């Protein structure tokens, strides 16, 4: 079938298998150009492995360090004439490329928050890897059903204590708009922490440790975004910020647990990129469009694979990791360059409907958004029929 992009709001409801595969190959090629990751991991578990930063971590570990990988994700398979999700096709392509290079790859498809998927993952580690020496936690989900209580918690993107008016882009109409966000209630804050805080990461590490599948010296990291002044009302000072602070508290306990066996636990702070999650946040399309404009002009723009490949080489396995005062690994240094942030702030209130394209890189933002779903990738013939029914080998469901 011929598949074209169909966008509804902040979601593209179609995906292109060949485009997703080409995107994965582009990321692999980037890692290969940078050469081997010295003293890198050899057996890696990535929780949230099918898109964005999690996929990039799996690619960097496998094709940079030669690691065997086990990926956990929650994706929809193709059915009848309906394509699967982008994460499904990304993972299928990853498996194909790994097999071609003789790299072990296993995947588990299901709810990472559940005890069932944790148990299935542990069984797969025992069977295929024995133990893992790196655990990457890269889960972004709007809701979580707690495995012990059965309660489903919904995350909320709101300020705390007062309403906030945010500038942003109505991406459907390509117009500047303002959104008034009311403050979160205490219950909404608690629910957001339950979904996006550190509890599930801790549950994963506790389960892996109790099962004996964490190697001595194992490391774990959870990915997060902090941002700067422009985004603080929504991120650090908002309901999501409370979840991020919970992540910072959680990592201290995990670090103590792993350090006893020569290991380590860190929160890794990554730069703002286009993801399905960030596209839904009212101010982020405008912020990203300005950030891309400024960083591309300076030659410092990076996407997921550049960020995570650099994180592994420079900090997780580098001799001189970039660590902040709170012990987090920082890969967002170029985004937070004072000159970059000052220029973004300078342009923020100047953007109008009339100058949206010349003043920002909204065109680049839109292109990156479509790339998430396999569209706009160089070398792909989007007028040619493509087979949507792609399977993932070594998949556990």
From Swiss-Prot:
Enzyme class: oxidoreductase
Keywords noted in UniProt: Fatty acid biosynthesis, Fatty acid metabolism, Lipid biosynthesis, Lipid metabolism, NAD, Oxidoreductase
GO-annotated biological processes: fatty acid biosynthetic process
Binding site for substrate: 225
Pfam families hit by this protein: Eno-Rase_FAD_bd, Eno-Rase_NADH_b, Enoyl_reductase
Catalytic residues (positions): 235 (proton donor)
Molecular function in Gene Ontology: enoyl-[acyl-carrier-protein] reductase (NADH) activity; NAD binding; trans-2-enoyl-CoA reductase (NADH) activity
Site positions (Plays an important role in discriminating NADH against NADPH): 75
Organism superkingdom: Bacteria
Pathway field: Lipid metabolism; fatty acid biosynthesis
EC number: 1.3.1.9
Catalytic activity: a 2,3-saturated acyl-[ACP] + NAD(+) = a (2E)-enoyl-[ACP] + NADH + H(+)
Protein residues bound to NAD(+): 48-53, 74-75, 111-112, 139-140, 244, 273-275
Record family assignment: Belongs to the TER reductase family.
Assembly and binders: Monomer.
PANTHER family: ENOYL-[ACYL-CARRIER-PROTEIN] REDUCTASE [NADH] (PTHR37480:SF1)
Role description: Involved in the final reduction of the elongation cycle of fatty acid synthesis (FAS II). Catalyzes the reduction of a carbon-carbon double bond in an enoyl moiety that is covalently linked to an acyl carrier protein (ACP).
Protein name per UniProt: Enoyl-[acyl-carrier-protein] reductase [NADH]
